[in-house]
Every structure is written in C-alpha cells, then in structure tokens.
Design a protein with these regions (language model features):
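Conserved ATP-binding/catalytic motifs of P-loop helicase motor domains
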Residues: 1-329
C-alpha cells in the first residue's frame, strides 16, 4: 500500500469506533487476519500487540451455518502460509482468542411454529430424528408442481449456471446477447473467463449476458443503496430500449420490491413512462473497474494493474448459490 493510499484510508477511518462483520460463518480465518493486518497498516499500529488496530470488532452470526468457500473457519488456523506463520508466532494470544462470546438464546425468526423451529435447530447440529423428517416431508413438493419462477438453490456455481440457462431456453421470444466491452493497459493480458459462472475473472459480470423479455434477473452491483438498487435485488425484464446503432442501451426491469428504483424512474421518465404499468425501472450498462492478475509467483498474485469493463450489472435469477442467499437473508 502506497503512502498516499494509506493516508487516504487513514483519513476515511479516522472516526471508526466499531466494525461489525455479519454472517461470521462465511468469514474465513485468512480473511479475519487480513482485516486485522490491514487495519494495523492503515492506522499505523503494531499488528503483534494491537488486535484490529484497537478498533472494536463485533462478529455476528451462527458458526453452525455455511462455512467459508475454500477456506478454514474463522476460529481455525489460517490456510495461507504467510498468514499461518504470523498466526503461529502469536502463541496462545491469537486474534480469535480476543473475542468474547455473547449467545442469544431465543429464536424469533420462526414465530409461533415451534415444530418447524425445533426441526431447523436439529438440522443445524446435524441431527435428524423421525419428528424432524416428518416435518420436512410436509414441505416436499414435486418439481412439476413448482411455479417456474421458484428460486432453486445449488451448492456449486456450475449447477446455478446450468439451471439458469435451461430456464432461459424454455422462455419464448428473441434471445438478446450483450458482449462486455473490456479494456486493459497496453501489454496486459485480457482476463480469463470463469468456466463455471461464465463471468470475467475477479468480477461477477458476465462476459456475454444473454436474456429475453420475461427473464428473471438479479442485480450484481450496488447501484444506489438509497434507491434500493442493491446487489441481490431481483426482478423481471419487461422491456428493452435500443440505441441508434440497434444495440441494447438499457433493459427495463419490474423489480420484486416496488421501492426499488423509484429515483431511477424519476430520473429517466422517457423510459419509465413507457413501462409505467409495470413500474418499470431502466437499468443501463455499468462501467466497472477490477483487478487484473498480472504477476504470479507460485500461487501468489499481485494486482499491479486494473482493467475496466462495460456490461449490464445483471445475471439470470432462476437459481442461486446457497452462499449468496445466506448473505441476503
């Protein structure tokens, strides 16, 4: 981190008193130590004696839920060799040992449904009694009886992509394909495409975004949190507007939440007015800056350059990963 970048970050964090990290089960040990080390670097504190640069940290969540992707749980040894070396040097005074647990004993999420709550609590700790199985069987529905728009959850990204593609093929109408416009510094290799998610490396943006009118989609970028246009907002495409060159300029989305995009609709009345009956919100292609993996030594990458892309901040939303949905809940 350059002195200029560190100084700017220090100014931003000058009044930080409490850092809250939600969904702690998804936070890996490596990430926890990276947060600690980065805070110490920015605030110029001793990483061996000042946990999180003496900033109060609150971890919120349930460690019995989904574990980190490709990582060790937050209370375990880090996976990265460099971080593990630092971890071992702390002896018994690990970062995790500094936390004090506070346990909430009453579950209010399931309301008055005690049977359902008891079943979920058993599953949480890996138990399945006959009564739990009986409760779960009351929730089983054959796939042919499901609403076609019912969201499917999968563990692997490839299964998510396959189901989304299958549902798009079943949808009548013209298939529209929009290729991302990618620019990188001269002499830098263009980014790879993730074979499972079909996204541009280090991003959630599709290399080619394919859709039809009527397709279910989800925002993958926080466009405007004050307008409820957040990463994870779902809806249905109800229209497409083209530029003079007959390229898709924006898509019109009927979001599931009526509050999504109210400011955006007011900003672009020429588009939203034509789709007023759908409460349609125009969504344009977004310019996104991302890290490029430019140098590698062993398994370590150094993000020495940045690329830019122009693409719709959307993906199909007939299916999602369990990890993504846990973060949304």
């Amino acid at each position: 981190m350059s002195d200029k970048t560190r100084a700017a970050a220090k100014h931003t964090l000058a009044n930080l008193k409490l850092l809250i990290i939600d969904e702690m089960s998804l936070v890996g040990a490596d990430m926890l130590y990276r947060i600690h080390k980065r805070l110490c670097t920015i605030l110029e504190m001793n990483e061996n004696t000042d946990p999180f640069a003496n900033i109060n940290v609150m971890l919120v969540g349930d460690l019995m839920q989904i574990p980190p992707v490709m990582g060790h749980q937050v209370f375990s040894e880090p996976k990265d060799k460099e971080i593990l070396s630092f971890y071992n040097g702390l002896g018994d005074q690990t970062i995790w040992s500094k936390f004090q647990p506070m346990i909430l004993k009453h579950n209010h999420r399931q309301g008055e449904s005690k049977g359902w709550a008891d079943a979920l609590n058993e599953i949480r700790v890996g138990i399945s009694t006959q009564s739990t199985e009986a409760v779960l069987r009351t929730r089983v529905t054959k796939e042919e009886h499901l609403d076609e728009k019912a969201l499917h959850l999968f563990y692997f990204n490839k299964d998510v992509t396959d189901h989304n593609d299958k549902m798009l093929k079943k949808l009548p109408g013209e298939l529209i394909s929009v290729k991302a416009v990618i620019s990188v510094p001269r002499g830098t290799k263009t980014p790879d495409i993730d074979p499972g998610k079909k996204t541009i490396a280090n991003t959630e943006f599709k290399d080619v975004f394919e859709f039809k009118i009527g397709a279910r989609v989800m925002m993958i970028h926080n466009k405007d949190l004050t307008d409820d246009l957040f990463n994870g907002a779902g809806g249905t495409i109800v229209g497409i507007e083209y530029s003079d060159k007959q390229q898709a300029k924006c898509v019109i989305i009927q979001f599931d939440l009526p509050t999504c995009g109210a400011k955006q609709r007011a900003k672009y009345p020429n588009y939203s007015g034509r789709y007023k009956r759908f409460n349609g919100t125009p969504v344009f292609r977004h310019e996104h800056e991302f890290n490029l993996k430019t140098k590698s030594y062993g398994k370590k990458y150094f993000h020495a350059a940045k690329g830019k892309l122009l693409q719709f901040p959307l993906r199909l939303y007939y299916a999602s990963s369990a990890h993504k949905i846990q973060v949304k809940l």
